[in-house]
Amino acid sequence: MNIIEQIEKEEIARLTANKTIPAFAPGDTVVVSVNVVEGNRKRVQAYEGVVIAKRNRGLNSSFIVRKISSGEGVERTFQLYSPLIAAIEVKRRGDVRRAKLYYLRQRSGKSARIKEKLVSKAAVAAKAAQ
């Protein structure tokens, strides 16, 4: 492992020490809690939407979340290990067959819906046994 990879791995460990990042994939509906600074006030703002793309590049990993706000599609790119992200919560898992869901940009209404991924009974039983 070269020096850059080692430094990036240490930085990721430092940034994730006080928060947990759940496993999520494109198609999942997530709520991203973002720290917003307005003047001297600091507050947490929730941004809920569908993950349409995820870019895994170590420390430079990012993901794009799309939501419909007052009839208009809004996309926001987040850096996965950004200190501005307070928390990420997965609301529901989506069952998709693509890594990048850019086709959702042209869709609206019912055609933009994503089928929910159902958990098998065997997986539920295994989780309950733990």
UniProtKB/Swiss-Prot annotation:
UniProt cross-references to Pfam families, sorted A to Z: Ribosomal_L19 (PF01245)
Keyword field: Ribonucleoprotein, Ribosomal protein
One GO MF term attached to the UniProt entry: structural constituent of ribosome
Gene Ontology terms describing biological process: translation
HAMAP family: Ribosomal_bL19
NCBIfam families in UniProt: rplS_bact (TIGR01024)
Name of the protein this chain belongs to: Large ribosomal subunit protein bL19
